[in-house]
């Protein structure tokens, strides 16, 4: 029984990625949203990579049989060829998604290497087992 009650926490990255993919595809033409760091073939631009890089249990009860809440941290990496304004526009949409879902956004870093621009940031929040992320 506890296994079923805790499955929401272990599948949270997939849930968030699915919502983010839907949101980004409706705002940025041709974007590839993925959880896979590597893919075979020619790179696709723009690409948004979602990785859960950490997560702790929150709201633990004395019984501690179920996960009541988690505090996941996601790292978002956006890559694109082209103008700085283009990737910044994509980053604005991604940050807006996380802010609408009540995440804290931090560590926004922009780089360029071999004509490929990258924007990376992190997003974190506490979410309870009965909460639902808004479907934007």
Task: Write out the residue ranges for each language-model feature.
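Small/polar-rich, solvent-exposed N-terminal microdomains that initiate assembly or binding
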Residues: 1-62
């Amino acid at each position: 029984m506890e296994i079923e009650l805790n499955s929401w926490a272990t599948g949270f990255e997939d849930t968030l990625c699915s919502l983010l993919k839907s949101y980004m595809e409706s705002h940025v033409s041709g974007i590839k949203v993925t959880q896979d760091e590597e893919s075979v073939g020619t790179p696709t631009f723009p690409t948004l990579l979602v990785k859960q890089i950490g997560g702790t249990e929150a709201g633990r009860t004395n019984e501690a049989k179920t996960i009541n809440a988690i505090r996941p941290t996601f790292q978002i990496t956006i890559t694109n060829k082209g103008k700085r304004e283009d990737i910044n526009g994509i980053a604005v949409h991604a940050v807006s998604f996380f802010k609408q879902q009540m995440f804290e956004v931090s560590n926004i870093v922009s780089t360029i290497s071999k004509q490929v621009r990258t924007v990376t940031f992190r997003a974190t929040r506490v979410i309870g087992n009965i909460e639902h992320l808004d479907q934007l």
